[in-house]
Amino acid sequence: MQKILRTGTLTLALLASVAIPQAANAFQESPMLKAMVEAGELPPVDERLPTNPTVVDAVEVGEYGGVWHRAYRGPGDRWGPTKLLEERVLKYVPDADGNITLVPAYIESYSVNEDSTEFTFTLLEGLKWSDGAPVTTEDVEFWYKDVFLNKALTPTIDPTFSPGGEPMKLEVKDDRTFTVSFAQPYVYFLNILAKDSTGEPSLDRPSFLFPKHYLSQYNDHYASAEDLSKAAEEFGVQRWSDLWGSKGPVTSWWQNPDLPVITAWKIETPAPGNVVTMVRNPYYWAVDQEGNQLPYIDRIEHRLFEAADSFNLMIVQGQIDMQMRYVNSSDFTFYKENEEKGGYHVGTWKSANVWSFVPNLNVQDEQLNKLFSDKDFRHALSVGIDRETINELGFAGLGEARSVSPISGSPYFNPEWETHWTEYDPDLANELLDKIGLSERDDDDFRLLPNGKRLQIVVEAYQDFAAPILEIAADYYRDIGIELLPRIIDRTQWDDNRDNNNFQIQYTPVDRLSVVSADPRNIMGNDSYAQQYYAWYETDGEAGIEPPQEAVIRQIWADWEKASVAGSMEEADAALNSMIGAFVDEGYVIGLVGEVSIPVIVKNDFMNVRNGLVEDDITRGVGLGQTQQFWIDQNKQ
């Protein structure tokens, strides 16, 4: 049975079972790997691939070899490289029109029972880790029992993977087949898998596959306390549990060249360093339509840069082969004018992000805490800024003024949500601020807090190009008596401030607005406007801060709980729409500009890059373009 949600530019198809096409009898491989086979360093390609590899339909059949040159911002910039190579049990793939479909990745098939309580998956026969070890359900069971349910590593399980309060259960059928079950229906589970069963080792996400043969030596169910203590010391962390997680030096692919992976490339020279390199995985499990083992490209090189001007210079000098990350929309004209000089062309993708101000409802400053929790204050912040000016000056007019809500083309798009509180109205902003008791002003015409101090708010961003945007915003807020203090800080510090509840407002692109059901946590407050409230919710009150009984965020959580146990897609979507509506109506996050046409730099010899796709964290950013089928045309160099 096929269930389809179709609206505009996005199509979500959930297939109960998908037959993997039979690959050609004879497979081809990169000359780089062929040389290793001839030297006796690798087995033949037929022995490295699964019996029936997954087939990736390349835009056109490519050629092997070459280095993909990119740029990165430092050790904290792991997500740029990560999204080039993530793999999921199921993944979103664009069709010829750019609509997305859910298809199997490293599995042979899957099935769902009638009430969506059981999901059965069969791994590809002959699937292998990058070191050649077989991938089996023993790795799945290791992840589930020794990581997911291990309180030392995963003290709390995210609500999106414990609907109704009960974590998912695992049953291993044989060495390739396993079943995940829930106590109640979970119609969104496949959507969530396509977002979160990734090559990035999030401990409480259904990654399903952790290499037991390698990681068990760092796990307390297998290793002695003495050995774990030695490992922690060796890797420079305080506790053995710190070895784990997406930032752990053992389980982070970005940091550990020894970690076996199933992705198209693996880390070769990790950060920090001026150049980070990734090299092809000789055991990657996919081929193109003619039986050529993927990826086409041998290596990916990320060169360090510190300032936006330096990155733009790299582009103009032809040093960037293909990149979307850090390519600034406000510089679109500059990029176009230098196409011939740099030997590239500029494509565009549509961003599902909304650049936004995220007030911290849990901010430690008592005066600001009270204001940020006041709907009228958030309303004033929203209507007190001219988004059209922000769009023109900050994004070259390539976006649109909008709230944080599902993008056009999403199954959950609502035009009324899109324009909620987005019309510039400084008179209304002043009226609202006076109404809530901020009518007193100092000699510079800034409003005074009840304690007599000037109303000052620090807004922090980590992008260089955000500086002029924040200055424009500061001018608008000055007109309504608020002193906005912009700060540009390092990305690592920005993340730490968010994680440690040490910020007032953060300027950031709010994502996951295409298929919201795949990851609603931004709307629920996680890593966003109410991190401490979400921690309280996630841990059943053991951590974080309890929200007031009247707080609308409680309704948002209740709506998700209804959606996550609904018996039908219609019932689930009704609850999800209620959740989104409550979030938008409260104005918890102040959206500014979204649906931006993102410039994509593509060298003229860099092939198979699709144009016009949707960029979102849900679909794993640039990964939606199927990077393993990108190739470099040596004849055009």
Feature annotation, model-predicted:
Residues 1-24:
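Gram-negative bacterial Sec-dependent N-terminal signal peptides
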Residues 72, 259, 265, 271-276, ...:
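Detector for C-terminal structural segments
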Residues 63-74, 108, 118-121, 140-143, ...:
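Short, well-ordered beta-strand elements
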Residues 143, 147-157, 170-172, 268-283, ...:
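Extracellular/periplasmic solute-recognition and catalytic clefts
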Residues 108-154, 179-181, 189, 314, ...:
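Aromatic- and charge-enriched surface segment that lines or borders ligand/interaction sites
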Residues 29, 35-38, 43-114:
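N-terminal lobe/hinge region of extracytoplasmic solute-binding protein
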Residues 159-244:
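Surface-exposed binding/hinge segments that line
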Residues 124, 250-256, 278, 283-334, ...:
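Ligand-site clamp/hinge motif
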